[in-house]
Amino acid sequence: SRSRPAAPGFAALAIAPPKKSRPAAPGFAALAIAPKIAGMAELVQVTDTVHLVQGHAVNWTLVTDDTGVLLIDAGYPGDREEVLGSLRRLGYQPGDVRAILLTHAHIDHLGSAIWFASEHGTPVYCHPREVGHAKRDYLEQVSTIDVALRIWRPRWAVWTAHVVRSGGLIRDGIPSTQPLTAEVAAGLPGRPEAVFSPGHTNGHCSYLVDGVLVSGDALITGHPLLRHRGPQLLPAIFSYSQQDCIHTLSALAEVDSDVLVPGHGQLWRGPIREATEAALALAR
């Protein structure tokens, strides 16, 4: 089955027995007072029409033209005020968002899109193979048990606390999600070109817009859980198929771009092939 087993409730995590050689994992009440991931969302101009927003633990991208804004990914549910703030800094309101384009439907990328779709009727698009995931017909996401087994590690404890605070436990989808077609893409700000990049999820898709590769989680440059900074893959625990993630690097290497806007981490400038080679070297 493409779907992973439904994640247990967090009440179950409180009674999950830790291994004897490790400190007991904190209860999720304790996570509420754990140290926060530092920093405010940073707005970074990439081109005249593309802005990267680096949130606390995830990024989103704003693409503008004279018709409005295309939002690529939307952070956690709890990132909504930061998303709205990034729009306001460019002079836009929620109603100016023409559409939301998802690289994939994990909660840290789909989160505030739920609000835009329900409150403003904002169209939400993704690759056809990701539509069912966005609607929550199934869920391809790391289970809470997998996370619980790792929160004895400081980085995992801090990151997990951020997930809890940011609404990362909800299982809501967006029933109105539609598949992105070439015709739809041609009418959106920036005229994004889909670059199918499965692995992190079965229907993950990156986008080329104004010469910039918006890679989602197919290729990142950093994450609160990772010490290394620079082009790399996310840990295999977060992906539907790590082998497909590695294969996808070859497809991304063919993209004609010298700018990488990742789903996590900082903006990266240089030939995309160099970024994919660096990520592949780390994955081996």
What do these predicted regions represent?
Residues 5-13, 17, 23-26, 31, ...:
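Intrinsically disordered, low-complexity proline-rich tandem-repeat tracts
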Residues 70-72, 101, 124, 213-215, ...:
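Residue-level marker for buried hydrophobic side chains located in beta-strands
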Residues 76-78, 166-171, 175, 184-187, ...:
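Metallo-beta-lactamase
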Residues 88-177:
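Active-site HxH/HxHxD metal-binding segment of metal-dependent hydrolases
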